[in-house]
């Protein structure tokens, strides 16, 4: 359990640092050692979600709930993955199921509220999510003055994020006025018309509904600025960047409160490859946007463009910093994907930059000294550092495998031996150490197979020959109790998988009742292989 906790903590630190693949590896190794630990599946679900692999996040969320049905966090993980997969109805049901077990769980309550809001948005269009929302409000004199009030902007953002709150906000006259502007109808007169039930009001003449404010309602400077912007856009599309810059600059002079004209200038410099100027203009645009309470989506775009400029220069650490700033303002799939791409490249760069065979040799020698003294934990640390410094050296994995075997961490020893053999298939030590780990686990059949592979490479290898003889004698003389056999067998992940297969359990029951059925089942090579595995580990015997 100490090894499991250590791997879990390493995974948590890696996830916090943004090293998602490292976190996944740690959690997966811990799960192999403790497959019934619900917390490990929950943590791995979070890591998969952060990576963008929502299907695997969902599968781990389901496993968490199966292992610990009364734990609210499991339902949160499962529901969050369903949300990312756009399976909103299922996510809602999952939150509801979780609340049956933990009625006061705040995370589940908020998740359910958000899910209900998103489902409501699907059924009814949310006018507060219009792409040109602030432009419409600024164009209409009824709402233009309201935009200078910070509480009004907070109200708008609240209704954008939680449209289900609209029903509770209708008492606010500002909300009714805003709806009138956004929907293009005069909601203020509706109550009066409903009260005059008889006689009913005559049907309104066609096209008498209040028209949406047109460009004519804008001040002259803003109208001219928009025209300059359109001219700039046309020039930009034709890649006439100098002309585009002149028009955007003129638009900015006419309407200095609109950050869009500055970000358009930044886009031109981005295309020209002048990334310093692009970043300078984006920073200026953000400053103008903050001062004039611009929509957070526009702020996010400016930060994303700064991130893109650093990405182009292969300055991935800076790019990640600004992508995260953009995501904090407004989360979009494109920016998230770009950020993850930059993180992956940066991680690989750091890994490659860390490689140094000379330092790896120093760490290996330190590890050898500690191993000779019997200080196996310290030796393992030195070998691990050596592997980071030179991950293509097969002997380092072999040395660390020897440490793991001394520390009775046989599964980890086997993993290192596999890596060693893969890197250098003719290296005898990789095979003998793998066989030694299997022998220590009392898996004599597998151990003999591996010792034989070593002898195939070098028939004079005394270590392999002696090991083969030991395993043969141990297999012949073994008198394990049924409990020992079962406990040892069930520690093997392959056996666990076979025994958890409902079809195999049915076949084994049938073999007990009708031994003649065995010959039929052995005709299927897949089933025959599984039965042979169970025989090898001593779980079943055929007489």
From Swiss-Prot:
Modified residues (N-acetylmethionine): 1
Modification sites for N6-acetyllysine: 8, 301, 312, 325, 344, 446
Signal sequence, renumbered to the chain: none
Residue ranges, compositional bias (Basic and acidic residues): 205-233
InterPro entries: STI1/HOP_DP, STI1_HS-bd, TPR-like_helical_dom_sf, TPR_rpt
Record's subcellular location: Cytoplasm; Nucleus; Dynein axonemal particle
Gene Ontology terms: cellular component: dynein axonemal particle; nucleus; protein folding chaperone complex; protein-containing complex
Residues where Phosphotyrosine is found: 354
Residues annotated as domain STI1: 130-169, 492-531
Keyword tags: Acetylation, Cytoplasm, Isopeptide bond, Nucleus, Phosphoprotein, Repeat, TPR repeat, Ubl conjugation
Gene Ontology molecular function: any one: protein-folding chaperone binding
Residue ranges of the region described as Disordered: 191-233
Sequence motif Bipartite nuclear localization signal, location on chain: 222-239
Matches recorded under SMART domains: STI1 (SM00727), TPR (SM00028)
A GO BP annotation: cellular response to interleukin-7
Cross-link (Glycyl lysine isopeptide (Lys-Gly) (interchain with G-Cter in SUMO1)): 123, 210
Main location: cytoplasm
Modified residues (Phosphothreonine): 198, 332
The TPR repeat ranges on this chain: 4-37, 39-71, 73-105, 225-258, 260-292, 300-333, 360-393, 395-427, 428-461
Phosphoserine PTM sites in chain numbering: 16, 481
Note on domains (UniProt): The TPR 1 repeat interacts with the C-terminal of HSC70. The TPR 4, 5 and 6 repeats (also called TPR2A domain) and TPR 7, 8 and 9 repeats (also called TPR2B domain) interact with HSP90.
Function recorded in the entry: Acts as a co-chaperone for HSP90AA1. Mediates the association of the molecular chaperones HSPA8/HSC70 and HSP90.
Protein's name in the database: Stress-induced-phosphoprotein 1
């Amino acid at each position: 359990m100490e090894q499991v906790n250590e791997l879990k903590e390493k995974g948590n630190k890696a996830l916090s640092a943004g090293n998602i693949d490292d976190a996944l590896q740690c959690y997966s190794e811990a799960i192999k050692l403790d497959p019934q630990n619900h917390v490990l599946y929950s943590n791995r679900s979070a890591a998969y979600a952060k990576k963008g692999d929502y299907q695997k996040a969902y599968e781990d969320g389901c496993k968490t709930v199966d292992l610990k049905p009364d734990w609210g966090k499991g339902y949160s993980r499962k529901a969050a993955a369903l949300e990312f997969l756009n399976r909103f109805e299922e996510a809602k049901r999952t939150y509801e199921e979780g609340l049956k077990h933990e009625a006061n769980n705040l995370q589940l309550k908020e998740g359910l509220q958000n899910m209900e809001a998103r489902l409501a948005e699907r059924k009814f269009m949310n006018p507060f999510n219009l792409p040109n929302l602030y432009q419409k409000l600024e164009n209409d004199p009824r709402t233009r003055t309201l935009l200078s009030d910070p509480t009004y902007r907070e109200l708008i953002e609240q209704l954008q994020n939680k449209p289900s709150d609209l029903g509770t906000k209708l008492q606010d006259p500002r909300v009714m006025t805003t709806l009138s502007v956004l929907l293009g109808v005069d909601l203020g007169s509706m109550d009066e018309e409903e009260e005059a039930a008889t006689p009913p009001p005559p049907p309104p003449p066609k096209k008498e509904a209040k028209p949406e404010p047109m460009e004519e309602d804008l001040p002259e400077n803003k109208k001219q600025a928009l025209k300059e912007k359109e001219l700039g856009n046309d020039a930009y599309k034709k890649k006439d960047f100098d002309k585009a810059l002149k028009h955007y600059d003129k638009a900015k002079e006419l309407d200095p409160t609109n950050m869009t004209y500055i970000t358009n200038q930044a886009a031109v410099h981005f295309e020209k490859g002048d990334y310093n100027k692009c970043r300078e203009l984006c920073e200026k645009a953000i400053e103008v946007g903050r001062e004039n309470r611009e929509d957070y989506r526009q702020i996010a775009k400016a930060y994303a463009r700064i991130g893109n400029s650093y990405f182009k220069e292969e300055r991935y650490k800076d790019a990640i910093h600004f992508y995260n700033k953009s995501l904090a303002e407004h989360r979009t799939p494109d920016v998230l994907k770009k950020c993850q791409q930059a993180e992956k490249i940066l991680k690989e760069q750091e890994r490659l930059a860390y490689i140094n065979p000379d330092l790896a040799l120093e760490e290996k020698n330190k590890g050898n000294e500690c191993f000779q003294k019997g200080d196996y934990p310290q030796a393992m640390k030195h070998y691990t550092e050596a592997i980071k410094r030179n991950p293509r050296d097969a002997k380092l994995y072999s040395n660390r495998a020897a440490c793991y075997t001394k520390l009775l961490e046989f599964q980890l020893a086997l993993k290192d031996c596999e890596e060693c053999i893969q890197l250098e298939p003719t290296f005898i030590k990789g095979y003998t150490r793998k066989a030694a780990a299997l022998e220590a686990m009392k898996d004599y059949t597998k151990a003999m197979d591996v010792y034989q592979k070593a002898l195939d490479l070098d028939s004079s290898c005394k270590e392999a020959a002696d090991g083969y003889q030991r395993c043969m004698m141990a297999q012949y003389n073994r008198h394990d109790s049924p409990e020992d056999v079962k406990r040892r067998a069930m520690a093997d992940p392959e056996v666990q998988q076979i025994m958890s297969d409902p079809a195999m359990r049915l076949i084994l029951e049938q073999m007990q009742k009708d031994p003649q059925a065995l010959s039929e089942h052995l005709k299927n090579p897949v089933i025959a292989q599984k039965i042979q595995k169970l025989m090898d580990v001593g779980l079943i015997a055929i007489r």
